[in-house]
Amino acid sequence: MAKKVALAYSGGLDTSVCIPILKEKYGYDEVVTISVDVGQPEEEIKRADAKAEKISNKHYTIDAKEEFVKDYVFPLIKANGSYEGYVMGTSIARPLIAKKVVEAARKEGAVALAHGCTGKGNDQLRFEAVFRQTDMDVIAPMREMNLTREWEIDYAKEHGIPVEVTKSKPWSVDENIWSRSIEGGRLEDPSFVPPEEIFEWTTSPEKAPEQPRVVDIGFEAGVPVSLDGEKMSGYAFVKKMNEIAGENGVGRTDMIEDRVLGLKARENYEHPAATVLRQPNSRPLRNSSLTRSELKFKKIVDDQWSELAYYGLVDEPLYADLNAFIDKSQERVTGIVKVRLYKGALTILARSSPNALYSEDLVSFDSQTIDQKGSEGFAKYHGFQARMYRKVMDKQ
């Protein structure tokens, strides 16, 4: 029986050179490649399919776009997911991709699982958190052979594998419907100004339209459901919002990120929809619909949720526990937020919710609904301990 290995395949340089390496260096008879569509460009999927058909023994392309948005992106929106300001598009996609690879591997009777991640990044951990739940061997050629990008380019050319990157522009790009990351090459130098050519989703703010774009975003139970009154599926909504926000220059991040291993890395991201959808949900509707105690506690929950998601630990029991609280807290986060997008800036213009705890009548300076004299007793004891402390210190 042929000795099979299942490879998580993106069509990029790293995973493409893994195919001959797994045969030549690791002795596998067949390499089954699995590409998972989580919103990459259609041409990228086609390019990966065409390449895999030529150099692998069997290839799968699995459409997981709607599943990705429904089961991974929407929970992130409800959790206000963010790691050091990063919207975690790559982070939340990896566990889903890994699970689809495992499913295909079992179908094929593979004895091993492989990925093309390096030993310096986070993705090796995210993939293997899922892979190592199986009894199959786990192989990481990039890490185990300590490969460099230049070596891979030469090796690919020797084996007739088409190479999109070059030694002078070795950008590594990872893309799904939620975000696009660009790293590597000269971008690793924090003092290097990224060339405009690395950006594809977002217009330079200087070249964005002169007229602002105003949109109404409808939310139900914490997730977006409509754009300017039009109901949309999750994937269609995020895709459309990427287009609108991106053409108005919204959604670029250039940051120094703390990786799981402790290394600091320079990362460039594009995430137009993520920038827009997290803001309206996290501020206007939540702040008007949840109590102060809920909001305070939810910040703690959101931070812990984000860390687990960034680490790829979505099968950790605590992750499910946190989601239970988040889902319950978001039941009342329903309403419409009006947003203005203009030359890279996002501004919340207005919000309305049937569940708002805000009362214009109660808070108005002109309202007599609340007798202001009633707060006098509260004011007398507000800061009481600080006053007592001051008296004690003044006596010393």
Swiss-Prot record:
Keywords: Amino-acid biosynthesis, Arginine biosynthesis, ATP-binding, Cytoplasm, Ligase, Nucleotide-binding. One of its GO terms (biological process) is argininosuccinate metabolic process. One of its GO terms (cellular component) is cytoplasm. L-citrulline binds at residues 86, 91, 122, 126, 172, 181, 257, 269. It catalyses: L-citrulline + L-aspartate + ATP = 2-(N(omega)-L-arginino)succinate + AMP + diphosphate + H(+). It is found in: Cytoplasm. Its main location: cytoplasm. PROSITE patterns: ARGININOSUCCIN_SYN_1 (PS00564), ARGININOSUCCIN_SYN_2 (PS00565). Homotetramer. Belongs to the argininosuccinate synthase family. Type 1 subfamily. This is Argininosuccinate synthase. It comes from Methanosarcina barkeri.
